[in-house]
Curated annotation (Swiss-Prot):
Protein name as catalogued: Testis ecdysiotropin peptide C
Organism the protein comes from: Lymantria dispar (Gypsy moth)
Function: Stimulates synthesis of ecdysteroid in the testes of larvae and pupae.
Length: 14
């Protein structure tokens, strides 16, 4: 999730 990835310090890119 790109939006969530932009707002989290963790490397989540789904």
């Amino acid at each position: 999730i790109a939006i969530f990835n932009a707002y989290t310090p963790l490397p989540f890119a789904d």
